[in-house]
UniProtKB/Swiss-Prot annotation:
Residue span, Tudor domain: 513-570, 703-760
Disease: Cataract 36: An opacification of the crystalline lens of the eye becoming evident at birth. It frequently results in visual impairment or blindness. Opacities vary in morphology, are often confined to a portion of the lens, and may be static or progressive. In general, the more posteriorly located and dense an opacity, the greater the impact on visual function.
Protein source organism: Homo sapiens
Subcellular location as annotated: Cytoplasm
Highest classification ranks of the organism: Eukaryota, Metazoa, Chordata, Craniata, Vertebrata
This protein's record includes keyword Manganese: no
Gene name tied to this protein: TDRD7
Protein name as annotated: Tudor domain-containing protein 7
Annotated function: Component of specific cytoplasmic RNA granules involved in post-transcriptional regulation of specific genes: probably acts by binding to specific mRNAs and regulating their translation. Required for lens transparency during lens development, by regulating translation of genes such as CRYBB3 and HSPB1 in the developing lens. Also required during spermatogenesis.
Amino acid sequence: MLEGDLVSKMLRAVLQSHKNGVALPRLQGEYRSLTGDWIPFKQLGFPTLEAYLRSVPAVVRIETSRSGEITCYAMACTETARIAQLVARQRSSKRKTGRQVNCQMRVKKTMPFFLEGKPKATLRQPGFASNFSVGKKPNPAPLRDKGNSVGVKPDAEMSPYMLHTTLGNEAFKDIPVQRHVTMSTNNRFSPKASLQPPLQMHLSRTSTKEMSDNLNQTVEKPNVKPPASYTYKMDEVQNRIKEILNKHNNGIWISKLPHFYKELYKEDLNQGILQQFEHWPHICTVEKPCSGGQDLLLYPAKRKQLLRSELDTEKVPLSPLPGPKQTPPLKGCPTVMAGDFKEKVADLLVKYTSGLWASALPKAFEEMYKVKFPEDALKNLASLSDVCSIDYISGNPQKAILYAKLPLPTDKIQKDAGQAHGDNDIKAMVEQEYLQVEESIAESANTFMEDITVPPLMIPTEASPSVLVVELSNTNEVVIRYVGKDYSAAQELMEDEMKEYYSKNPKITPVQAVNVGQLLAVNAEEDAWLRAQVISTEENKIKVCYVDYGFSENVEKSKAYKLNPKFCSLSFQATKCKLAGLEVLSDDPDLVKVVESLTCGKIFAVEILDKADIPLVVLYDTSGEDDININATCLKAICDKSLEVHLQVDAMYTNVKVTNICSDGTLYCQVPCKGLNKLSDLLRKIEDYFHCKHMTSECFVSLPFCGKICLFHCKGKWLRVEITNVHSSRALDVQFLDSGTVTSVKVSELREIPPRFLQEMIAIPPQAIKCCLADLPQSIGMWTPDAVLWLRDSVLNCSDCSIKVTKVDETRGIAHVYLFTPKNFPDPHRSINRQITNADLWKHQKDVFLSAISSGADSPNSKNGNMPMSGNTGENFRKNLTDVIKKSMVDHTSAFSTEELPPPVHLSKPGEHMDVYVPVACHPGYFVIQPWQEIHKLEVLMEEMILYYSVSEERHIAVEKDQVYAAKVENKWHRVLLKGILTNGLVSVYELDYGKHELVNIRKVQPLVDMFRKLPFQAVTAQLAGVKCNQWSEEASMVFRNHVEKKPLVALVQTVIENANPWDRKVVVYLVDTSLPDTDTWIHDFMSEYLIELSKVN
């Protein structure tokens, strides 16, 4: 293939993986991340990259935005059209195309330092060693020699079914195009078969139960070796792994294996193979240490133990429950200690379930048994290995944790004793038989194994994975399939291999006899080959469930073939989930119908709340500008329509209560109706219920999530609220369903709706009607604080107002009304609409940007541009906080002096290390660091600011440049430095704890009270040491950002530049990424090499 054609194909593959296109400055980096090389546009005869791209219009579509930014998009072609089908293909006879669904969920980032960073254990600093770090990895010196610096972890971890060796069209089948497909649900097969939860599944041919029962139990089977991939040289890989393990008889961490593999064989070890080790007992033994963490230990295979297990008809476990890695006795140590001493040590360790430091053993031993501890015991810990498990820290024999060994089952002890006295000749004979069985499996790839073990389906680790909803019978058992590289894309590749295997092998014939529960390969419609399990059998037909798709079908026996074991290494892709918030109505036919119509055949982003056997999830439709909570939408869709308020145009309504007025002039009203009366009665019953019942833990909200409806006690009454945003485990935002008020509260202040009232409460629709004043002059423009204040003083919480409806906007959910007070009804010339336009309230003052006075004792609080003011959140909302506010936030216009600023944050001295987090990175010459040790304190402060300012009064302040304030940015309150005042009502601020520059509405700026001035400002401007460049290109800046932004790193301080203002301090540091197990990546070395490579290309 010509180089130009190859570059075009690789370029199309890169662009097809980015639905929203790739900005021109980022294209080189994206291309290199996939291919390892730059786009060689100069070698192809073009002076610039853009010139080359414009020369291949069949591959690239170029668009230029209004701001001048150039974005590249992929052009479709027949050769790569099937790439789009790699996303969760739903096999059925009828397919329909629908709107494309984007499931890149815009997750609300509430704790960037924890949710987006790595755990503290990744930083090799002794003060932050967690159980993970202690039990998992050695603790060497913080930094190693810089000559060993650059170690880059591959971004993409390949699936067992995503391996290829050619560069033709087939080579691009593993490039997933995710979250774009709407699948058909017309051809549903019934009866619906139950599918397994995502846990360990064993399927037996001898099973006689129905599918629904069969998939929820575990049947132990002999271990069979399923190949990870049949396009890969698996035998060679397995032999190499054997060689590595033989060199490490004491075991090796599974996370370190790829590093050793690459060092020895100069090749990358496919990441998918790491998941197959548990199914290779003839290659290795896998153990999980009890010291915590997710890493596993690998040992050379124990052939004789495996041998007994393979031939044992009683399915006895292979070995005792694995403990931590044990180190053999050290040379030169004394002989084994007395049995009574070991027995006492074993009894002592039983009392320490979390383990006991070896150094603490003598004292604990003497205190318990009142006898002297043997002097040489600690020098020979290995001799205690037969009575306890020993976990050496950092390979240091002087530092170890001792764990009590778990007792073996009685039948296992007896069996091992019998085996120990067995005849050597019998052992040799059985071992010979085992070798013959192993050889026969290797010789015949067509051999069908009657008993097959399929690995369990693992829940994706990413924050918001994508799922395709297949079908549901109730909301507690929704059949889904995960969409992604290791799931739907891997399955597509496997099915292509199945098609090739069964279509081109004439020796394979259909099954003659089948059993319920047996796994088969079925030739389905459109010449597709699918994995299926037998549910029932008839004379010439069998009923099967397609285990990767979740639906059932009757097929002819002539289309069913024995499933080759090599197609069993991929987990069954269809699984179940439970929709959060809908449990109480899970079987309601109306709810099931609504959920099915909104979800089946579509792809959604999913928030996994509880990773149980059947995960508890919230589905989000992210195809539009805003994320739509599907769970909440379905719940609102089944409300009792007879309890809704249906406003009629030109109708008059009296006794209307204005419950809320937002800062943009939007009103929320309550209109007397049947639903409001029923709600009042129900809330009174709940009040009596809580008054008579002792408050237990079941009444508190233990698992908050967006869209959940619960209760909040406000001004002596219980009110309905819906959670709209979860900031952290302590603080969240709620909206009062029946008044429209939005505020922030503590999780501990919420209560679950008692089960006996839950169904009735959910059925009542929200009673707050969103309105706006009709026929206001267009010249009014943006509402001024004075106009909002006048409207609040006039009608807020007035229960006998009247409205006349002029228009109902169904799409926006808002009614245009004329509003009247009791004195002025029904004269339209004296309506609130006319009065507010005649008043002198619309002059935008230059020096005052915020309303000055509260509207009275019952006046509520405002919250950002959409924060309503309601009696529900007035001064009595949280009395203790309001008292503090009144004392600390007095009326004044002068800014706080610099003497009231917190002390500067502590930085290490030049030449010393410190753990840091990088929240913002522009380029190596400018980025921001935060001390890792202070992040928890910052999290607590942010939560307190959310709760504090959500109930505080808006203050009349004259803001000044270069002064410190509190400002609300994206639903969070930050400590900011005001950098500039714009004429359009916005101000420019600098976040003093995160180092970001933002534009916010001036109404969201408040004084920073003393209680939030104690913690030093956390953001420190930094520059990368060890690299020189006067001007950084966008490409180099992006590479730098990708390696450091939102990551915890180790910083070696070179210079600290002090300044009187804490936000003007600067530090010059070396940055080191210590996340890899054996390599410290010095960022300045990496950037230097990158600049050299870039200069070669240019």
